[in-house]
Amino acid sequence: MFKRSCSSSCRTCLVPLVAFTLLVLASVPRVAAQSRISVSVSPATASVRSGGGTQQFIATVSNDRHHRGVRWTLSGAGCSASACGTLSATSSASGTPITYAAPPNAPNPATVDLTATSVSNTLKKASVSITITSNTALSVTISPKRGGLAVMQSLRVTASVLNDVGAAGVTWSASGATCSGASCGSFINVTSTSANYVAPSAAGIYSITATSVADVTRSASNSIGVTDLSGVLTYHNNVSRDGTNTHEFALTTASVNKSTFGKLFSCQTDGAIYAQPLWIPNLSIAGTPHNVIVVATQHESIYAFDADAAPCNTLWDVSLIDSAHGGTTGETSVPSSGTGALVGSGTGDISPEVGITGTPVIDPTTSTLYVVSKSVNSSQQFFQRLHAIDLTTGNERIAPPQSIDSSIAVPGTGAGSVAGLVAFDPRNESQRPGLVLSNGVVYVAWASHEDHDPYHGWVIGFNASTLAPVANAVFNSTPNQVGTLSYSRGGIWMGGGAPAVDSSGNLFFITGNGTFDANTGGSNYGDSVVKLGTASGLSVADYFTPLDQASLDANDTDFGSGAATVLVDQPSGPVAHLLIGGGKQGNLFLLNRDNLGKFSSSTNNVVQAINLGNSIFATPVFWQNNLYVAGVGAPLKQFAFNTATGKFGGAPFSQSATSYGFPGATPSLSSSGSTNAIVWALDNTLYCTPQSRGCGATVLHAYDATNLATELWNSSQAAANRDQAGHAVKFTVPTVANGKVYVGTRGNDSSVLGELEVYGLLPN
């Protein structure tokens, strides 16, 4: 086809290459171009702390058809090998993280290059620059470090990370001895340094941990006690009056000391706080749930405070003598001083005024507070009223309140009787005992002011739904004259205690000095333990009177200066149903509730008598077969109960180093079931009225319940008066709930007339 053309001189042949080339190209098939491999690494830059800091990296390889991933290498101008750091793996699949750990010391220069190289195509790679920060320790702190919380409630927790790398913050977790995962609680509203911890539904001790994102080996934890306590709704915690809160998980024998426990805040009131503060959880007020502490004052006021808020948050407060609460024009609290001796004989036993004295009681099903007020007008007309207060608003739930006056009377010839009737006297009768709520009836008891005659002991039942007096539910302890005695007495005051209630609804209380003839068929029960049946009104079911009753009466040695406690049933013991109480003579009588013993002039028909050696103005605590009580001028004492013999040891099992002056102490006890029990007691010696030896701060004490010689803390220990309380009030009782202890005081008796002190675990 083609001819070769050659030159003879150069032997050169010319070939038409263009045509040949076109022919070759036309004969080669076309192949599609391959996609190129690419590598990227994230994050693109990082700072990692030397000496333990870590950072995850991920290489992404695109178009790697054989899925061979990458190989990782480290290099640096100022380092080599492990001095540049270490890797958790030297190769990885695309998208699989590896962890870089910084070297112990930062190189110089403090930059390391981390390179990911494609295995399929080693020409394809990507690098990131890692800055190694100095080995200044990263540390995590958490706030609060300790605290208390009710089940299902939330607590704001915050973390601070010192020398945090890249402001990475923390992650949150919760743990506990008997839980895992979500059953230990959950977290909401989470940020890099804060969260709301939501407690689980089970009570216990939980730990919240904040873990550094930049260095997972660094973390901080706290301890939160979560309680399922339904409330402190009545005097001494429950109707048995045993004074125990066994649902306390925040306050332990390890956590209560002057380094971690102290005064958190105070709430001022308009008058002295004689009644025990009451605590109720998860109460909705104005659409917001609160744990609430309720306080009553002698200035006729009720306060509802947020039980946890610092500084103090008053949710509402009301006066029980304004028109909205049944008061009339010109009514005031009853002045203790001045002309006319409006309170007793005018000696100022309760000073400077009388308004609300007895501890109220709460019905949690209706959120109702039952409380009795006492007032007077300018005409010296005296008023006592039973109020049913809506705890969500402070308003009267049942209006008007129930007047308690001379329209209530019993047949009798006793002191102050007229025409064969003894009428209730709102002037002379002192509503000192705590109120009782049992089976839909509110029971209220009275004694005297300063033994000012004529007076009697009264117990009256009111329908909780209507406040109307219950038919036949009126008891007078001394309705009839005995011999030629001009007085009756027999007041029910019990050092501010409250009648106890057993599982059958029977009421138990102790009367003070007064006339007695029940042993001869009479109806007078001075200086006696009385058991009232409540099935049909009120009726005496049984009683016990000491053999020396006549001497007790003649010498004002009240049996009823202290109150009774119903003990836990002893089904396998010699006596299944027991009661204990004592008075000014210093004898604690252990009684059979099914057969109290009545009266014998030759012997006391009791299970056991323990001579404390000191007058008793207290309600004993009973916990895990141990009794706790403090007489006047004596230490707090622990007596161990022997379940086999059904009796207490005659000598104290342990006692405190501290002695309590007049009036002794009614303790309270907190525990986590059968462990971490703490006995709390107030030294109210300097209670500021004319009969007191002085005026000064009440002192709160905390003891290990297994050995009272071990004092854990008291409010006078910390420097600079950090934990000092307001002035003492005679007979007051501490309330323990949800990691806090609430104490009513009289403020400083000048610029502050009343104050609630709130103690608890110091948050930091």
Predicted regions: what is each one?
Residues 75-101, 105-106, 174-194:
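Low-complexity "stalk/linker" and mucin-like segments enriched in Ser/Thr/Pro/Ala/Gly
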Residues 65-80, 128, 166-180, 220:
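Short, well-ordered beta-strand segments
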Residues 35-43, 136-144:
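Proline-enriched interdomain boundary motifs that mark the N-terminal boundary
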Residues 119-126, 213-220:
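Short, exposed coil/turn segments at beta-strand boundaries within extracellular/luminal domains
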Residues 126-132, 220-226:
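C-terminal edge beta-strand
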Residues 227-570, 576-598, 617-639, 665-670, ...:
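Mobile, glycine-rich extracellular loop/lid and propeptide segments
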Residues 108-120, 203-213:
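A short beta-strand micro-motif common to beta-rich folds, especially ectodomain repeats
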Residues 46-53, 147-153:
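Short, solvent-exposed loop/linker segments at the N-terminal edge
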